[in-house]
Amino acid sequence: MVIKTSLTVLILGVLIAEVFCAGHSQCNRRENPVNPFSYYETVNGKETLRMCPAAQIFNKTSCHCNAVEVVPGSGMNFRSGQQNFQWSSSGSSGGGMGASGMGANGMVASGIGASGIGTSGMGASNTNAMMNAFLGGSKAGSGNIATSGTSSGKFKVTLPFNPLILKWTKSSNGGWGAETGSSGGMNSQSSGSQSGSWGSSSGSWGGSSGSMGSSGNWLNDLQFMGNMRPQGINFPAPIMNIKVSGTGGSSQGVLRAARPHP
């Protein structure tokens, strides 16, 4: 009788434990080693790749996507050991980033040059480990990048988790386009951005009036959204979140980037 009672209690205990654990199962998600903005989820034995919401990365500890951290201070820092850089819209005669822009603050030794981008500004042999851009042209034309010079190239951003190449082509009005951008601008769609600029209809990286934010401010939250075909492959997830802040005109602005939590 005692054995029967003990066996009944044991069975009931196992059933209760199973019911309890069913609502508290282990995380059925795992991180994506290639892209922290996504994760793999297993449901009914089938594993599916899922994307986190914009500007969030998967946290294996919480088993959820969490917001990324905005790097404080000026410049852009992906923990590459390089100096942060700043840019300024002053010092350029025809648009572009200006003589007192990136070069003077740690991006490249010879800088962008007084005439805009410059042929030896962001060249292949004179960049740091964080950013490597291949841009042509003697100046930034009417405010766009490389309106004259080479018609194609690549913009390489080295992230701590995966090197990434964003291809660009010179479009009809000289912006950065993403493969087939028809109206210029570095955009999130392969068909071209709405206004030929980086998220601003009045300027900001290639507006008709000149350099960065020369007519209007730079308070734009921008994202590389993946259709920019890194390494020729559609990448259906945000790559990084960039905030450009400043007051417009010839004032100096600050480029800040989001990064994952350590």
Swiss-Prot record:
Signal peptide limits: 1-21
Name of the protein described by the UniProt record: Glycine and serine-rich protein 1
Biased composition regions of type Gly residues, renumbered to the chain: 174-184
Tissue note: Component of the acid-insoluble and acid-soluble organic matrix of calcified layers of the shell (at protein level).
Main location: secreted
Sorted UniProt keywords: Glycoprotein, Secreted, Signal
Composition bias type Low complexity, residue spans: 185-203
Subcellular locations according to the entry: Secreted
Any one of the GO CC terms: extracellular region
Region of interest (Disordered), ranges: 172-212
Top-level taxon in the UniProt lineage: Eukaryota
Glycosylation sites: 59
